[in-house]
Amino acid sequence: VKHVNDRIKRLRQEFFEIRPEICPERARFFTRSMQDTEGKPIILRRAQAFYDVLDQVSLFVGDDEIIVGNQASKPRSSPIYPEYSWEWLVQEFEGDPYDFNQRPADPFFYTQETKQEILELIEYWKGKTVYENLREQLPEEINLAWDLGVIDDTWVSAAGLGNIIPDFDWVLAEGLEGVIEKSRKELDSLDLTQPGAIRKKWFLEAAILSNQAVIRFSQRLAEHCQQLAQQVTDPDRKRELLLIASNCRNVPARGAQTFWEALQSTWVILLALHLEANGHAISLGRFDQYLYPFYREDIKRGRITRDKALELVEAFMIKTNEINKIRSWPDTSMFTGYHMAINLAVGGIDADGEDAVNEVSHLVVEACGDLKLFTPSVSLKVNPKTDRAFLDKALKAVQDHQGGQPAFYNDVAFMEILENMGIAKEDLYNWAPVGCIEAHIPGKWDFAAKGPWLNVLKVLELTLNGGKDPATGKQLFQTPGTLETFESAEQILEAFKEQLHHYMSQQVITEHINDALHEQVDPNAFRSSLVHDCIERGKTLIEGGSIYSADGGPTTGIISAADAIAAIEHVLFEKKLLTPAQLFRALQTNFEDENTDPTGPEIRALLLNKTPRFGNDDDRADRWAVAIADFIGSSYHNDFHNSRYGKGPVPCCYSLSQSPVTGSVAFGRAVGPTPDGRKAKDPLNNGISPSNGAEREGPTAVMNSVGKMPYIWFQKGA
């Protein structure tokens, strides 16, 4: 951090000194409001509760802050959202499996008063939450698959829906008053005699109230800064606070007039979206594109210096790290690291197909290298037209950051993927990564990633055991054959495909039920009002208000499964180094039986070191990874529709996500020993990276293997 100024050094240091806590305020104000509005339409109740939260949540402004507004009563503290789930709160307050403040990762601290208040508040929510109703509505077979680690939908059933990018361009141009005006025009034009018009009326009324809530919140911030200005003695800080107060009075109510206002407006919108519902991966889109006009005008008029603009960008980026989310421990194990997946994109091309890199792009990359923070996730869209000097600066930032940022995205490949899905050509250039690595059209798409996880290696384990879980002996979906009876690797693949398709179907059924429940109890008007064409259609995102939609949850273990099939083919069918019975016995004993010939450890060494592995540019392994990914990707795209199909958005398919976050570790615990030499409970491969320790021929060979993968299905990234 040697390149940042003193203010930024202090803000960054303060962030690292803060310990995350549990904040009861949002749960308190939200619950009280919902209790007061029983009997009214749910969308109006949630809008009123959103207003009440923003009207009452505590405000604070740090001594060095120049971008203001807070999610909870303290920085990095997490609100509680009891409308989604409550069971895990009770369990973990009692230490099952860990007390929140004693977790081995992502601890949250709390007072006894906070614990008592939350336990009292959740009494109202028992029987009303998305998660408990989903588990009650799921068929027994799906619940069993969930419990055994084949699929898992906790992340979008025990929480709100995220993975969105609102239309920041629109808000910065017209402000939320423009959103309200558009909503009122649609409301005034409704013919209430028409079927469905009443529901549209409720949505538009909720959209107006929700936007008014955010304006009111910003006005409260202005009043707070005005009061602080009267108390401080330092004249420079006094002027600063008065200017911040002026910013908050103007934005996001109206269009931004300066670069500082544009950043403040963007921050308040991002913050409000996280307070409306706690889905993560709410992202910033093409940050450099919508902020550059304000920067350019300020520089032209002499209202700002480049150094001041960099300070503002860095203060903004530090501020994003305050947004936090407490998850259940099982969910935390899949998103370890206080992971919020707030993505910020720069680069790419403009509507004319020219290089879109501008001075704000440079500021972001410099800030990324200077701050060395993990939020926001800075992403660079790399196009053949991208300026080489800018690419060199971004590569230097990667070296400085030392944590993998900025990330580099193939702009052309993602445009091809999106066009293959049916996205309009005029929108392709404007795509942006959302959340972890998913492709999204800002302001036009609903949820870039949504749906149950799929544990591909677990499905292979079931396939090799005739559909039976070897750890519990429970019989799930049965297909012909076992490891001891299959006669070829191709025969295994066909049975594997049948199993995969079955569990993909279970994913879709689960998400249809989840969507129906979210539609019933979790319609969110604010975020919907900032995505086209929700206002015109009078629908929330979950009801089909957006222009584009495609579901699909994270998939993990494709490469591990490919390695396992390649190993079976090599040692059983080609070289005949082992008999099926020998390999089966080694798996049964977790490669630990010393009394066989060869011994379990010797068999494991053979599998790890003498079989083809993905990541070595070896088609004997790579072809299986390609076949598995192609089957999953094409099946999602061609065989399934999400719940918004036929309601307005397109293409409403499912698509393949290979972004496991830390799910490769969590799902590994559900899988026994596998024929690739992996022991029980060990991690699966990460994304489309080779399995741990599998790459033998260096990084070029790894890239050659990865380059063979059928990326055309990877809308949700890899």
Task: Label every PLM stretch briefly.
Residues 215, 222, 226-229, 238, ...:
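Heptad-repeat amphipathic alpha-helical coiled-coil interaction surface used
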Residues 1-206, 236, 240-243, 247, ...:
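Conserved catalytic cores of very large enzyme subunits
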